[in-house]
A protein has these predicted regions:
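Alpha-helix N-cap/helix-start capping motif
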Residues: 48-49, 96
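Charged, low-complexity surface patches
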Residues: 44-45, 99
Length: 141
């Protein structure tokens, strides 16, 4: 009989369950802070419509800008951000390779346009979900 089926081996299962619960709690804390910042008027840039819907489902009510809907270019997104007149903007694009590339490009271009960028939510969520979740709309599930 494999060791995992022996009596008392539930410790590993319980430890994993506890770890997953702690991870979920941390993700929820980050999302609560994100909702607070959004409520204060800090816009959030996401990739598309599904990401907006996911954030709305998670209770985020403030301004959310879609970076890739309707064939927008980076210049279109920058122009939309400048119209917001916000002191700071949160970038929360997907966690895949293309999302990382767009995040880098947006950050560079927006900083050049003298816009303060907040990547802390992206960094914290990526550290928590790693390769388990590839996109923002996956956070809602």
């Amino acid at each position: 009989m494999p060791k995992c089926y022996e009596r008392g081996s539930n410790n590993k299962v319980n430890a994993l369950s506890t770890h997953l619960q702690e991870k979920e709690e941390k993700i929820l804390q980050v999302l609560e802070c994100l909702a607070e910042e959004s409520t204060k008027g800090t816009p959030i840039i996401v990739e598309g419509k599904n990401d907006i819907e996911a954030l709305r489902a998670l209770g985020i009510e403030g301004k959310i800008i879609s970076a890739k809907t309707g064939g927008k270019s980076i210049l279109d997104v920058i122009s939309e951000v400048e119209k917001c007149t916000a002191k700071e903007i949160i970038i929360l694009l997907d966690f895949d390779r293309r999302g990382k590339e767009w995040t880098k490009r947006l950050k560079q271009n927006l900083e050049y346009a003298k816009t303060k960028i907040d990547l802390t939510f992206w960094s914290r969520l990526f550290a928590l979900v790693g390769t388990e979740v590839k996109d923002v709309d996956g956070l809602a599930s």
